[in-house]
């Protein structure tokens, strides 16, 4: 539901998600074609919540239901991943992976899941030029290349010391190609005219 972000605040819903992950691992964990399971896709943490101005970008359709909406904290996300790992790994051999999304906080995972027990964890990062723009990247070819070479590449290289890293999503959508400042990927669908 647009503008409603309260799942992590509801223990029953969190437990339901963990139970679904456990059932998926139990059912598919030994399948030859399975690479791994990712517990969450793009959990929105505090910095991204602020960068993307979520409550304005995705205005709540139901204001009452949206009351109390908030980003997922890193503390919650770390605990969720630990719990999910324990539930998933009980049904999967070590050659299957648990893939954790970085929550758009690529550099925040250096001290996490470094014990031998977690040798089959992969860190997934999703990179979008529109997010780089929202964080101040110059809207020029030179600006995009500088961002990739001087920020993104060194960060991924650094994090590869701690985890195998995959870039599970990458999008080149950008303001330069659109011919106008999209303010970090906004459009007429968000009420922003180009």
Where are the language model's segments positioned?
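Active-site region of glycoside hydrolase catalytic domains
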Residues: 2-179
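C-terminal/domain-terminus segments
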Residues: 176-194
